[in-house]
Amino acid sequence: MSLVPMVVEQTSRGERSYDIFSRLLKERIIMLSGEVNDDSSNLIVSQLLFLESEDPDKDISIYINSPGGSITAGMAIYDTMQYIKPDVSTICVGMAASMGAFLLSSGAKGKRYALPNAEIMIHQPLGGFQGQATDIQIHANRILKIKESLNKILSENTNQPLEVIEADVERDNFMTADEAKAYGLVDKVITKNGTGKDK
């Protein structure tokens, strides 16, 4: 069981307490921490849609500290980020690996950030299947299509040639924040909130 801190806000009308994540949501900040799965995806998609309905012209920030997870859950978040009107800024705190790195790179161009000690890792999709040979072949073909699709999007996000992406995701490819900036996964390494120090 995890402990979620409460914060108290005082206004002229009295006090109101929020859990910390609700208070951050009020500031248009979404946290993606831990595994990307159906539950976290549904929560983030709902928050993105809610924030768009509140103000379609104001940016939304997603702070990412995730080892990755489900491709379909991650693609639901990705598609919603592209679908909504507000720009979605992405910030890596800690680690963005696998689907976490994919989502980090999918933020609005010019608004993708990493903190100085963040670590980013890209690799090809993982899959483990068992059953009849024909079923295994169906799943293998599906994962190859997914790999091709993810590589094309990563190529667009980073401005790296598709062949470079294909080679670089063959194995786990770990990068520092500065290396991720040079690669095109993020636009800036920031040390201060706001405009930050451009590295």
From Swiss-Prot:
Catalytic EC class: hydrolase
Alphabetic keyword roster: Cytoplasm, Hydrolase, Protease, Serine protease
Coiled-coil residues: none
Gene giving rise to this polypeptide: clpP
Protein name: ATP-dependent Clp protease proteolytic subunit
Top-rank lineage group of the source organism: Bacteria
The UniProt record lists the keyword Hydrolase: yes
GO molecular function terms attached to this record: ATP-dependent peptidase activity; ATPase binding; serine-type endopeptidase activity
Catalytic reaction list: Hydrolysis of proteins to small peptides in the presence of ATP and magnesium. alpha-casein is the usual test substrate. In the absence of ATP, only oligopeptides shorter than five residues are hydrolyzed (such as succinyl-Leu-Tyr-|-NHMec, and Leu-Tyr-Leu-|-Tyr-Trp, in which cleavage of the -Tyr-|-Leu- and -Tyr-|-Trp bonds also occurs)
Keyword Hydrolase set for record: yes
InterPro entries: ClpP (IPR001907), ClpP/crotonase-like_dom_sf (IPR029045), ClpP/TepA (IPR023562), ClpP_His_AS (IPR033135), ClpP_Ser_AS (IPR018215)
Quaternary structure and interacting proteins, as annotated: Fourteen ClpP subunits assemble into 2 heptameric rings which stack back to back to give a disk-like structure with a central cavity, resembling the structure of eukaryotic proteasomes.
Lineage, broadest ranks: Bacteria, Bacillati, Bacillota, Clostridia, Eubacteriales
Family: Belongs to the peptidase S14 family.
Residues of the active site: S98, H123
One Gene Ontology biological process: protein quality control for misfolded or incompletely synthesized proteins
Protein localization: Cytoplasm
Record's GO cellular component terms: cytoplasm; endopeptidase Clp complex
Primary role: Cleaves peptides in various proteins in a process that requires ATP hydrolysis. Has a chymotrypsin-like activity. Plays a major role in the degradation of misfolded proteins.
Pfam families to which the protein is assigned, alphabetical: CLP_protease (PF00574)
Entry's EC annotation: 3.4.21.92
